[in-house]
Amino acid sequence: LALVIASPLIEQYVSAPKTEPLTEFFVLGPYHNATYPYNLTSGDVYPLYLTVDNQLGTQARYKIEMKFRDQNQSGPDSFNHTQSSLQPLTDFTFEVPEGQSAELQVNLVFNYAVDSLRGESILDEIVVNGTSVDMDGMPLPWDSEANAFLGNIFFELYLYNDATGTYQYNQRYVSLWVNLS
């Protein structure tokens, strides 16, 4: 009986943990799992699935910027919570209702040629969902430790800020290293 009387008092002090509003962002490989392409073949199609899960408490407007870099260029910085200074190759904008997820399929084709004399892989273009992005013959140097011509494809997440009327970096990105040999 004492417990029944005291339960409203106890409820004030012991309640379910409050969840913090957040956005989850992840990438899945061609088979909708964590099997990602690494050793790429020029001209082949590599599907990726980007998923954004909105747990912000309200509908949200997002933008994903796709970028590519070699080992010497800087990417996003997890410790300083900053995005990469590289220009995006393309972007995707969309809205996600509260408590729901959006999945974007991104089909990528890397067109490149290996220059054995110079010890580089020359990236001519990346085709994103059928649209060509000129990479201007971007050289990817040989990495003797990885035994590969490494490039990094990454996607940065931005959230629309109604107060400023701009998209702001949401401190979330996904990244895949690929070998263009």
Whereabouts are the PLM-identified features?
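Short beta-strand elements
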Residues: 163-181
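Helix-rich terminal scaffold detector
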Residues: 1-8, 114
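Membrane-interface segments at or immediately adjacent to transmembrane helices
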Residues: 6-63
